[in-house]
Amino acid sequence: MKKAIAKILIVSGEPAGIGLDLCVELAYKKFDAEISILTNCIALLDRARLQKKKIKILTKPTLHAGKGGLQIIDVPYEKKVIPGKIEKFNSLAQLSAIDIAVNACIEKKYDALVTLPVNKKILSSSGGKFTGHTEYISRLCGTQNKEVMLLVNNNNFRVALVTTHIALADVPKSITKNKLEQTIKTLNNDLINNFKIKRPKITITGLNPHAGEGGEFGTEEKRIIMPVINKLIGEGLYLTGPIPADTAFTEKYMKQTDSFLAMYHDQGLAPFKALSFNHGVNTTLGLPIIRTSVDHGTALNLVGSKKINANSFFESIALAITLTKNKKI
């Protein structure tokens, strides 16, 4: 029986950022998958010259051999890309590229999507607020009213978020019993179905300092978080919490946790990036497609330099391949 080969689609991200540099690096990294990149051919070749590397544009899908060839789907840019310098209309072309990529994955032309960093501020200027790939792709998939969520992953260290790109002042009112319950269920289901963890152990942080200290520093733990945890434990889920966030990410809990669930963006991502920067992978849970991405931004100041670290990008591709294989089991 012929082994199924994962088909991965990459969107190269902000043209002036390091996305193109990372794609050049990919040309010399072998993967057991067919990999296609949505990008501008001219800009990619220019970036390769800047890096003093030769790449070959491939016209037919093939196993990614890592011998300098890249399968490209050309995306037109309005102006010449100047490394490190934002050009609004080139940046906005990324929205169309994301649209094309997501639809291609929905139509099962590709097994998984890997996205490289974009400039959120520029993309928001298109008329609709762009708060991030997670929310934008969720709308494209028609899952915006479901608990789609961000999970960051580095081997067996995983952190998921209840809320993502909202102001800290808006976090408490955004955490309702229903939202928290659905978020925990989404996390649990994805860990079972996509990561193949039979009974996930999930450690949940509190919202307030000391997890509220019995109501002294806030009541969300007593009113919302604890009742939801108890309800779901009664339904058979393996949950621990609410744990004070300042001690949650310590060796004791790391050893007994398949995934942490943090209440807001920096509460979960600050410790994760401190421990896993350049090795972390973002993935979006609750979507009908597989989507992964790097754990860093556009890094305009590093474009064309030798300081670029491609580890997170390569790990994003590797996880996309793994999740594809798991989904087919």
Sequence positions of predicted segments:
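Anion-binding alpha/beta catalytic cores of soluble intermediary-metabolism enzymes, centered on
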Residues: 1-220, 225-329
